[in-house]
Amino acid sequence: MFFSINSFSHEEGANFSGAIIDPLRVHHAHIEDEQRINFSFIDDVGNIDGNNTYSHSLELAINWDDNFRWGSEIFIPYSNTGRSGADIGDIDIQLIKYAFINEPETILTGIFGMSLPTGNKSKGLGGENTAIEAALFLDKAYKNWYWGLNLELGTVVSGENETEFELATAVSYSFIDGTTDLASPKPQQNFVPSVSFELVSENILSGAEKGTNVVTVIPGLHLWHSKSDWSIRFGVEIPVSSDKENDRVYLLQIGTHKDWGGIFN
């Protein structure tokens, strides 16, 4: 099983629609400073020893300019999904994030990133592969509705041969009072609940596992405290394809969009 909680809002000065959420698995397109912890509790396929399996991560993002158009992001995983014990896994870095379209209700962002072999190989939590990825992320809001789309292509450039394509989409509805046109970036109500549904398809195009296609759905519940800019999110990742990595994954994410300058100054 996989379980996740997430916390989110928008950074001070960002005028994005309040209906634009940070989905559980789908990557959001809007670029902001972000601090988030992701917890994942996994029900493994074929797990017969009864051990609790988890895969958590620290997610940090930075906005490089006042227009929220350039940014970078890093994902640092920590799990016990290997052969023995828990440790850091392979780190993912989105080196360049650029928003080609950067409007309150529509954001289209291009990504160039890398996956680095930082994991503990002896514990089965990493390998010798260095991979690069290119992606397009879309956020689209209409009143209290949100739609997100990801197109990602990743390939190993050092190590075992493998190329993967991911298609992911999310839809959500946020219960923001008084919305007639643009959902307020800073609603007057203390708490904003949202319900979401995500669909993720991961296809291995080349390599030892060529032809593998893992499809999962993720229903989710989000709660945003708009006054503090903190938010929490829960979801369950459920496989719907014959190929699957886990029986269930329970997700819990907690996070915020605090300006890094305000944190360190």
Segments predicted by a language model, with ranges:
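Transmembrane beta-barrel domains of Gram-negative outer membranes and organellar outer membranes
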Residues: 8-158, 162-265
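N-terminal signal peptide c-region/cleavage motif recognized by signal peptidases
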Residues: 4-6
